Design a protein with these regions (language model features):
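Phosphate/dinucleotide-binding and metal-coordinating scaffold of catalytic cores
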Residues: 1-314, 318-442
Length: 442
């Protein structure tokens, strides 16, 4: 019996084949020409370069992590393209042409040559149609009139991806890559004891990215875009890069920490068995920029605490995979503050918890309102991260936060919602007080 295969490419290089067995299992095999190539690198650090079939769970988990987390979105993909199932192979058969990182998946009978960029420019009305497609049960902005527009964007939020050419937003054709992730408002999330109003998530994330950049963290550029009544966040993809002549858009290999550790997305949170700070810091010891990456990762943990970012799980940290299998940390992404949803029918500040715990005198500390500088210092000590560097990170935040908040506020567009600014700023300054008292900074 002939088993169905998907050929995996990185840019115009054939990497290997993904096979779905009769029992539904997924196997992967690197192509001999890829193993011999000077560009060779593992598809994932959980799938080392080797000859023969790889049959470990890491194969299924790697490809599954390329897909949206939401079962609802996956069902929409099945419905839109008549996919055979919600299994990674069957979904990626339909939407694997432009995935996260450098992965392109196409059927055996298709070939990839040196890519010729092709796209369709969107009018404002057409852009609005793409951005509101999810309301009509259409996944990832893949509207019915565009059968050639097939992308896969991981994550839990409603989003799509588009190509930016000059000032125009475009739908890519064929295997032309996208340049931006377009994120839609999350809306309301109903929980047993609260309703979380994230209808302003676009503004929230934009604000957090600006503040992160102002404080020296490596984050992607982003802008708020509008089409008709739609307000969305366009985030520049750091897994894409134009060639020198700006004629070809290259895909850059990367993977998230669930893929790195060979884990399913269902355990992306430390509380569910996923990696925490200690595991990721140990992994970053092997980075090609280990000292910088470990410093930046610890700095980002403090930033998440200050802004009340509760979603810093394993899928929200990634590494670039370089030739030969070396790796380094990517920019930080998917940053949103929980402070604007406090109060009313929302949640109490005592309910806010970091996704990855800090070391305390007894066990782990995750409750944001119970965390103090000493918990970061205790964590650094356990990790053998230099105490002087941890003090430097904390004291720098103590010194920089007030001016950074002012600078971000003055740079915001005039129609930016004041309640988002007030909620984040008030709580950041309250937690900042713990730093300023510790380091004697007024």
């Amino acid at each position: 019996m002939v088993m169905p295969k998907l050929v995996t490419w990185m840019n115009n290089q054939r990497v290997g084949e993904l096979t779905k067995l009769a029992n539904g299992a997924h196997t992967f095999k690197y192509a001999p020409e890829w193993l011999a190539s000077r560009y060779a690198r593992p598809l994932s650090l959980s799938l080392p370069l080797q000859r023969g079939n790889i049959t470990s769970d890491a194969v299924f988990n790697f490809f599954d992590n390329l897909l949206p987390d939401s079962p609802i979105v996956r069902d929409r993909i099945v419905k839109r393209y008549h996919a055979k199932s919600r299994q990674p192979f069957d979904l990626l058969s339909e939407i694997g042409r432009d995935s996260v990182g450098a992965v392109t998946l196409i059927p055996e009978d298709e070939t990839v040559t040196c890519p010729i960029m092709a796209w369709e420019k969107l009018t404002e009305a057409r852009l609005e149609e793409v951005l509101t497609a999810y309301k009509a049960d259409i996944p990832l902005g893949m509207i019915r009139e565009e059968n050639d527009f097939r992308i896969s964007v991981a994550g839990a939020q409603e989003k799509t991806a588009l190509l930016r050419i000059g000032n125009d937003w475009c739908i890519p054709k064929g295997i032309t890559p996208t340049t931006h992730i377009i994120k839609l408002p999350i809306g309301e999330i109903r929980q047993p004891n609260a309703t979380l109003d994230l209808s302003q998530s676009v503004d929230n994330e934009y604000y957090c990215l600006l503040l992160a950049k102002e404080l020296g963290l490596n984050v992607p550029d982003a802008e708020i875009i509008k089409a008709g009544r739609v307000r969305a966040l366009a985030v520049e993809r750091f897994d894409r890069r134009w060639n020198t002549e700006r004629t070809v858009l290259l895909r850059l290999p990367q993977e998230d920490m669930c893929q790195t550790f060979g884990l399913p997305s269902s355990v992306k949170y430390e509380s569910d068995g996923g990696p925490g700070i200690a595991q990721i810091m140990a992994f970053l010891m092997g980075s090609s920029e280990a000292l910088k990456d470990r410093y930046d990762f610890m700095k980002f943990q403090v930033f998440q605490w200050l802004i009340g970012a509760t979603d810093g799980h394993a899928k929200n940290f990634s590494v670039f995979i370089q030739a030969g299998g070396s790796y380094r940390l990517t920019p930080f992404y998917d940053i949103i503050s929980a402070f604007p949803v406090l109060g009313g029918t929302g949640i109490h500040i005592s309910d806010l918890k970091l996704a990855m715990g800090l070391n305390a005198s007894k066990g782990k500390k995750t409750a944001i309102d119970k965390i103090y500088p000493r918990h970061f210092l205790a964590t650094a000590k356990v990790l053998k991260f230099p105490e002087v560097q941890m003090h430097e990170i904390l004291s720098d935040f103590a010194r920089m936060i007030p001016a950074a908040l002012d600078n971000v506020k003055t740079s915001l567009p005039t129609d930016f919602p004041e309640n988002v600014v007030t909620a984040v700023e008030t709580n950041v300054l309250r937690l900042h007080g713990r730093l300023s008292r510790e380091y004697g900074i007024k």
